[in-house]
């Protein structure tokens, strides 16, 4: 079992519809999900990310990504082969991957062939990067997720 991808493992579970997997990731997990999209796994129907990226808060400083140009470049590389529909959700006050950076990432991804809906929600809390951690945020992102998934049924 250890040699199987987690997606394959989960798809084998009786509670999972094996050819209808939706991957969800936040922050670095969202970045991993963007990378995963480039693999086009047959069981993955869609991918949803919240505040996806890597390299934020260098030296503990907000809005200080260690290599934003490389992040954008890598996002474009993933988009070249990705054909899985994606939903990307960010907030205006994300101090790890603010709108300017996340927009460039999205443009790079879709500009090379990737398919991703991009949404920037209004500011949430003191740092919108943690939107997904709060039950109070569900009414903000749940309609986007529902609409996205409804289109894929």
Q: Model features per residue range: what roles?
A:
Residues 25-35:
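Glycine-rich nucleophile elbow surrounding the catalytic serine of serine-hydrolase chemistry
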Residues 35, 100-104, 136:
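Generic recognition of short, well-ordered alpha-helical segments
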Residues 1-14:
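Alpha/beta-hydrolase active-site loop
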Residues 112-153:
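C-terminal catalytic histidine-bearing segment of alpha/beta-hydrolase fold enzymes
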Residues 36-45:
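Conserved hydrolase catalytic core segment
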Residues 46, 52, 57-112, 117:
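The feature captures the conserved acid-bearing segment of alpha/beta-hydrolase catalytic domains
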Residues 14, 40, 109:
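Active-site catalytic pocket residues across diverse enzymes, especially alpha/beta-hydrolases
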Residues 15-27:
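Alpha/beta-hydrolase fold nucleophile elbow
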